[in-house]
Design a protein with these regions (language model features):
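A short beta-strand element within the Helicase C-terminal
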Residues: 671-674
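Compositionally biased, low-complexity linear motifs
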Residues: 676-703
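Conserved small-residue
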Residues: 1-662, 681-684, 702-768
């Protein structure tokens, strides 16, 4: 190696991530339940493992013997030897099963007895799999920034725990555990973690030191003083600081306010109304169940009396009549319960007003920034830029005065005093930051001012994630998008849809551009190219390299598998769903007639505005999971007027559009797949002409608040373990779509649509 080369190598600068850019990777410990078992529990657990090993060995031997017995004559001595051996093994198998069951009971009772003990991590054990004790990488977040974690370094202050046994989880959530001389306590478990039975435990000393910084001075004690809250919501909001984020530079909390959400009714909308349990229904159900329990207790007492009497004793007539009356009452109560239940899970098509939460999770920045999701303590959602000067000029041109806006705590602000407008739906804990009043009931300090004081006092951070930095029209369909068109899509349509991918596939080995496209080396379609892809663009001759040839072969095989699962390339992109920003400012800052929604905003009824596509192009808006037929086809509106307001690559949606009810999305950062594929749009239009497209509409009941404690958090998480699976209803919906075809009758299709609507409601209830 030459001196010059050595010098070049020495000059290579291996840069680490800059603090706060969101790109840092931190290594932490991830454990299962085995390291947390106490010595006596671990001993029994290993014995159970050995018994399972022996049992599985016997099962393999029995399988081998049974396969041999098929080909051996019954009179053969070898057959008799095999049968004798089989009987001995079956006896052993039964013995091991019973012993394993007995040991399992001992194991469970031991864990139950040890729930009050403080556990510790035993790292020197012979674990069943590496999943039980291994290091994992997590991305930079507000939590690990607070804890001083550094890029590409291991941190012993955050531990991810996967718990299979609820007894162990019960123990550690109440008592914590010890590791390397530090005590760890339960921190949180977000929705994504709960689905995987994961939870985050952190160094108690560091948590106490940074608690106010992470949660802006709001403690469980303050929440409990005001009646508590739903525990799973609390976990979701406290886990916001675990999101992979970058610091929001130049953010000034003093230039931010929180206003009421924009919500209104659109009259005379045709919907599929699904009845859900109301608070009165809950009370009625509870009353009926309690009355049935009383009847059961009374009948049990009568039965005990009968059993204690001598044989042949004649029962009093009054007792017989009383027993019959109680039985009849119990029967009537059960019928009432069935009547009450029969109202649930039924749908009917109605014409009724539909409530549109227009700014659900959405806020506006009057300073120029990229559209992004935001994370502040207990604040989350989407924020998009709307130019202040353009709005002021619009009001001036239309002779509309701009008045002050009132925040949710009653304080007024002019448009020049603020840069960031958050909404109540974004500020998750707004009700726990109360106004401070004097003796006469006058406001001394608003709840938002208290939040801002705490934010600055404790050094809280404003963060961003999913920042919009370039969107390419390069997306793929999935099987769900196609299955909802199964009654309309023909073989020719599928061939037309797959034509681009087929050409790319056939071009491998023949066409350089096709091969570059297949490998993702296309600047127009790939915004995140790696070094190999960039090199291929500069030097396409690298396609002859053995490694690249192997990569092409593997990519081709992968493409074929993707085709079989319905993944076809389309001219589309996943973009933020953004409410009409002009309409929002008009609603908050002017006295325009709020009963005439047609005058609000720049996006008119039946249109959307997305600058990625041409003016007057037909666009299909989709959302995942795409379970029912929800293809929202709209005309794209792009002109000189819209360009003033569309400062993002997102899709802007007008006030009169009920798309949010069809696609069931929120405006807190949900992305829609927006495309202009003519084949899909043609099939979707055919479907809607024949069978219609009616949004599901229901009132989702709210969970009751609870006091925040280790007990309530444990109960909430364990309940989520058992009731948080959306896979089952989603798979059932797929099976229903598979029963349909272009030859299906209208009656069959409408019945399927009705059943799918009910299962979609189940999925949404499970998610929320």
């Amino acid at each position: 190696m030459t001196k010059q080369t050595d010098k070049q190598i020495e000059n290579i600068n291996f840069d680490y991530s800059t603090y706060g850019d969101g790109k840092a990777i931190i290594e932490i410990l991830n454990i299962g339940f085995e390291p947390l078992l106490l010595p006596d529990e671990y001993k029994i657990y290993k014995e159970i493992g050995n018994l399972k090993y022996l049992r599985n060995g016997i099962l393999r031997t029995l399988k081998f013997i049974n396969s041999k017995l098929l080909y051996v004559d019954e009179d053969d001595c070898y057959y008799k030897w095999l049968m004798h051996h089989k009987l001995c093994l079956e006896e052993k198998l039964d013995f091991y099963k019973e012993k394993e069951k007995y040991k399992e009971q001992i194991f469970r009772s031991l864990m139950q007895r040890n729930k009050s003990k403080t556990r510790k991590i035993y790292s020197n054990r012979d674990f069943k799999s590496e999943e039980q004790f291994r290091n994992i990488a997590i991305f930079e977040s507000d939590l690990n920034r607070c804890f001083g974690c550094k890029d590409m370094e291991h941190s012993d202050d955050i531990i991810s725990v996967v718990t299979y046994y609820t007894e162990i989880f019960d123990s550690i959530i109440h008592n914590g555990f010890d590791y390397k001389g530090r005590h760890f306590v339960f921190f949180t478990a977000g929705a994504g973690q709960t689905r995987c039975k994961k939870s985050t435990f952190v160094n108690e000393k560091l948590l106490n030191k940074n608690f106010n910084r992470l949660f802006c001075g709001l403690t469980p004690e303050i929440i409990n003083e005001q009646g508590g809250m739903n525990t799973n919501k609390y976990l979701a909001y406290t886990s916001l600081c675990q999101t992979n984020t970058e610091l929001w530079k130049n953010f000034n909390i003093d230039r931010a306010i929180v206003v009421d959400d924009i919500e209104y009714n659109i009259p005379d909308q045709k919907v599929r109304y699904i009845y859900t349990e109301s608070p009165d229904d809950k009370k009625q159900m509870k009353y009926l169940q309690e009355e049935i329990e009383k009847c059961n207790e009374q009948l049990k007492e009568i039965k005990t009396k009968k059993q204690n009497r001598p044989r042949g004793f004649k029962r009093p007539q009054t007792e017989i009549i009383e027993e019959r009356n109680i039985q009849n009452r119990r029967k009537a109560l059960r019928e009432d319960i069935q009547k009450l239940k029969s109202k649930y899970h039924r749908s009917e098509v109605r014409t009724m007003p539909v409530t549109i939460p227009f700014t659900d999770g959405f806020g506006i920045s009057l300073r120029k920034i990229e559209s992004s999701m935001i994370r502040l303590p207990f604040i989350k959602g989407l924020i998009a830029y709307c130019p202040r000067r353009a709005f002021v000029d619009w009001c001036s041109a239309n002779s509309i005065p701009i008045h002050k806006v009132v925040d949710i705590y009653g304080k007024s602000y002019s448009i020049n005093e603020i840069d960031y407008i958050f909404t109540k739906s974004q500020f998750k804990m707004w009700k726990y930051y109360n106004n401070v009043l004097d003796e006469n009931g006058n406001i001394i300090k608003t709840g938002w001012e208290i939040y801002k004081e705490n934010f600055k006092k404790y050094g809280c951070d404003a963060c961003r994630c999913n920042v919009e930095r370039g969107v390419k029209l390069n997306s793929k369909t999935n099987y769900q998008v196609l299955q909802t068109l199964t009654t309309e899509m023909t073989d020719d349509d599928i061939l037309s849809l797959a034509s681009y991918d087929i050409n790319c596939l056939n071009g491998i080995g023949r066409n350089v551009q096709c091969m570059l496209n297949v490998l993702g080396a296309n600047e127009k379609k790939n915004d995140h190219m790696n070094w190999l892809q960039k090199s291929l663009i500069l030097y396409p001759e690298m396609l002859k390299d053995f490694y690249v040839k192997t990569l092409l072969k593997n990519t081709k095989d992968s493409m074929i598998k993707n085709f079989r699962s319905g993944k076809f390339s389309i001219n589309g992109a996943y973009v933020f769903a953004i409410p009409d920003t002009l309409a929002c400012l008009q609603y908050w800052f002017t006295d325009m007639d709020k009963t005439d929604l047609s005058k609000f905003g720049f996006v008119k009824d039946g249109n959307v505005s997305c600058r990625l596509f041409q003016n007057q192009e037909e666009l299909d808006c989709l959302r995942s999971p795409h379970l029912d037929h929800a293809h929202c086809i709209r005309k794209n509106q792009v002109n000189d007027q819209t360009k003033t307001w569309t400062k993002s690559n997102g899709i802007y949606i007008g006030m009169q559009d009920i798309m949010s009810k069809l696609l069931m999305y929120d405006n807190d950062g949900d992305k829609l797949l927006v495309h202009n594929n003519k084949t899909i749009i043609k099939c979707a239009k055919q479907y809607q002409r024949k069978h219609g497209m009616i949004p599901n509409y229901y009132d989702m009941p709210k969970a009751s608040p609870e006091l925040i404690s280790s007990d309530s958090l444990y109960n909430g998480i364990v309940m989520a373990y058992h009731h948080g699976n959306i896979g089952t209803p989603s798979n059932e919906i797929t099976k229903i779509w598979q029963t349909l075809s272009p030859d299906s009758t209208e009656e069959e299709i409408q019945h399927a649509i009705n059943v799918i609507a009910l299962r979609c409601a189940d999925v949404n209830f499970t998610i929320d």
